[in-house]
């Protein structure tokens, strides 16, 4: 072959292109790279670009049958990480044609499928992705989005309230449905299947769906509000998952649920399409996320998983709590909360946002705060997350000394008090405890909740730590 020279080659000759001007259609990635000792950062960055696009370890003669320049990933910028020795941020640009339209699965297979086991790297973390409108427009995205959800539920101007039914495993379907009814009758908008409630011997999915639907209809009739229970449709096969979603639709309930990481992006996208076609809202749980995102120097940051979910489709997704954690993490969390909700998000490194992201018309996702929160956190949660969020109190509802319904009442009263105080111009960050105390004077349910949880106000680590 003309110009074909066999042998192993330096990646950086082909894949490190510091002069490259990124295109509006490129998918851009920011990797945190920790090279092995003796490997220069340019070579490591180029290796990442190569292995996640067209490269292989040696020159192959079939390279001559295509235009590598058109299809290769390019490492176009490298910067050291402040305060970390031998860590670098490598920026890689991928041409759009490397990816199948409308497939988060293919996007991840390409970008993170192979390169993380690469020998020249000690560790590698995908910190952020810039999804160009040319690509995001090939996705349906969330089945409904924030505004349509509010219109379907007829609930405006406040966060929504939820509760995970506990104990998560072992209840019989009828008792489960009863706990569900008590919570939504007391004032919550939603109750939730735990992520590992699928269809176990002690409670098969169909029984649970029936009793929860009964709870929803009874509570709706008594309160005049629209209620829901996140019926977990996650299953062992895609076909079984869709079967469960179909049954939920036949019962006329408003929302189903999916574990998108354990279930997989292909299953999740199928379910999201079904939900849009059939008017079901879709609640997403992120079970398994910490396996991928917890290590600071290896894996994938949750903001990337959140962007992927917005493309694949979901109306709610769990996003940590912020409360009782460090200030810095608060900014990072709010960064990906904005990436979930807003149409246009400016690059802001202090919030971990490496690229300006323009979602154009892709609907937004409601962030869900859950994990170790209770009534004393309500002012902080209202302040931090704003109206477009779901606040979920599992133990913070079911752990009420007077039981489930009063627990739900306490949470609803606390929320309404915080929203009213905020609307009157009071500063929840400063006066939050006072707002809760005032409300508890006329709500015995809230007073009892305040009493039982006063010891642990703000002094614990949230269970949902990133």
UniProtKB/Swiss-Prot annotation:
Gene Ontology molecular function: magnesium ion binding; monooxygenase activity; ribulose-bisphosphate carboxylase activity
Cofactor: how bound: Binds 1 Mg(2+) ion per subunit.
Catalyses which reaction(s): 2 (2R)-3-phosphoglycerate + 2 H(+) = D-ribulose 1,5-bisphosphate + CO2 + H2O; D-ribulose 1,5-bisphosphate + O2 = 2-phosphoglycolate + (2R)-3-phosphoglycerate + 2 H(+)
Top-level taxon of origin: Eukaryota
PTM statement from Swiss-Prot or TrEMBL: The disulfide bond which can form in the large chain dimeric partners within the hexadecamer appears to be associated with oxidative stress and protein turnover.
Binding residue positions for substrate: 114, 164, 168, 286, 318, 370
Gene3D superfamilies per record: Ribulose bisphosphate carboxylase, large subunit, C-terminal domain, RuBisCO large subunit, N-terminal domain
GO terms for cellular component: chloroplast
Compartment list: Plastid, Chloroplast
Entry binding sites for Mg(2+): 192, 194-195
Keywords, comma-separated and alphabetical: Calvin cycle, Carbon dioxide fixation, Chloroplast, Disulfide bond, Lyase, Magnesium, Metal-binding, Methylation, Monooxygenase, Oxidoreductase, Photorespiration, Photosynthesis, Plastid
Pfam families in the record: RuBisCO_large (PF00016), RuBisCO_large_N (PF02788)
Residues where N6,N6,N6-trimethyllysine is found: 5
Enzyme class: lyase
Alphabetical list of CDD domains matching this protein: RuBisCO_large_I
Cofactor(s), names only, from the UniProt record: Mg(2+)
Coiled-coil spans in chain: none
GO terms classed as biological process: photorespiration; reductive pentose-phosphate cycle
Function: RuBisCO catalyzes two reactions: the carboxylation of D-ribulose 1,5-bisphosphate, the primary event in carbon dioxide fixation, as well as the oxidative fragmentation of the pentose substrate in the photorespiration process. Both reactions occur simultaneously and in competition at the same active site.
Subunit organization: Heterohexadecamer of 8 large chains and 8 small chains; disulfide-linked. The disulfide link is formed within the large subunit homodimers.
Stated family: Belongs to the RuBisCO large chain family. Type I subfamily.
Note: The basic functional RuBisCO is composed of a large chain homodimer in a 'head-to-tail' conformation. In form I RuBisCO this homodimer is arranged in a barrel-like tetramer with the small subunits forming a tetrameric 'cap' on each end of the 'barrel'.
HAMAP family, A to Z: RuBisCO_L_type1
Protein name: Ribulose bisphosphate carboxylase large chain
Organism: Asarum canadense
């Amino acid at each position: 072959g003309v110009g074909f020279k066999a042998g192993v080659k330096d990646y950086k000759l082909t894949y490190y292109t510091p002069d490259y001007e990124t295109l509006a259609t490129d998918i851009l990635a920011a990797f945190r790279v920790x090279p092995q000792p003796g490997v220069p950062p340019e070579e490591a960055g180029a290796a990442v670009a190569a292995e996640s696009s067209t490269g292989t370890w040696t020159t192959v003669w079939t390279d001559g049958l295509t235009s590598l320049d058109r299809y290769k990933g390019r490492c176009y910028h490298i910067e050291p990480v402040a305060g970390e020795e031998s860590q670098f941020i490598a920026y890689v640009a991928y041409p759009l044609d490397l990816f199948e339209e409308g497939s988060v699965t293919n996007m991840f297979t390409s970008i993170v499928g192979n390169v993380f086991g690469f020998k020249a790297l000690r560790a590698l973390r995908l910190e952020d992705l810039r999804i160009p409108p040319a690509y995001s427009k090939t996705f349906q995205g969330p089945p409904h989005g924030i505004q349509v959800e509010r219109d379907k539920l007829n609930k405006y101007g406040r966060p929504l309230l939820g509760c995970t039914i506990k104990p998560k495993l072992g209840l019989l379907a009828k008792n489960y449905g009863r706990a569900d009814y008590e919570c939504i009758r007391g004032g919550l908008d939603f109750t939730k299947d735990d992520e590992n409630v699928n269809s176990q011997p002690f409670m098969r999915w169909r029984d649970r769906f029936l009793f929860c639907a009964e709870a929803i209809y009874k509570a709706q009739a008594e309160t005049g509000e629209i209620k829901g229970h996140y019926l977990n449709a996650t299953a062992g096969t895609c076909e079984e998952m869709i079967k469960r979603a179909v049954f939920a639709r036949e019962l006329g309930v408003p929302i189903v649920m999916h574990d998108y990481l354990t279930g997989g992006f292909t299953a999740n996208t199928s379910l999201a399409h079904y939900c849009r076609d059939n008017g079901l809202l879709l609640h997403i749980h992120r079970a398994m996320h910490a396996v991928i995102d917890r290590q600071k120097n290896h894996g994938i940051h949750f903001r990337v998983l959140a962007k992927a979910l917005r493309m694949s489709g979901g109306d709610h997704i769990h996003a940590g709590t912020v409360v009782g954690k460090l200030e810095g993490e608060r900014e990072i969390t709010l960064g990906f909360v904005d990436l979930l909700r807003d149409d246009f998000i400016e690059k802001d490194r202090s919030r971990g946002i490496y690229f300006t992201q323009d979602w154009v018309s892709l609907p937004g996702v409601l962030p869900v705060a859950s994990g170790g929160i209770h009534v004393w956190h309500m002012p902080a949660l209202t302040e931090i997350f704003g109206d477009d969020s779901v606040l979920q109190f599992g133990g913070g509802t079911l752990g009420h000394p007077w039981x489930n319904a009063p627990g739900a009442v306490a949470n609803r009263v606390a929320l309404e008090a915080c929203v009213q105080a905020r609307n009157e111009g009071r500063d929840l960050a400063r006066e939050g405890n006072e707002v809760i105390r005032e409300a508890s004077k006329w709500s015995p349910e809230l007073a009892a909740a305040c009493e039982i949880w006063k010891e642990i106000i703000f002094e614990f680590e949230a269970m949902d730590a990133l």
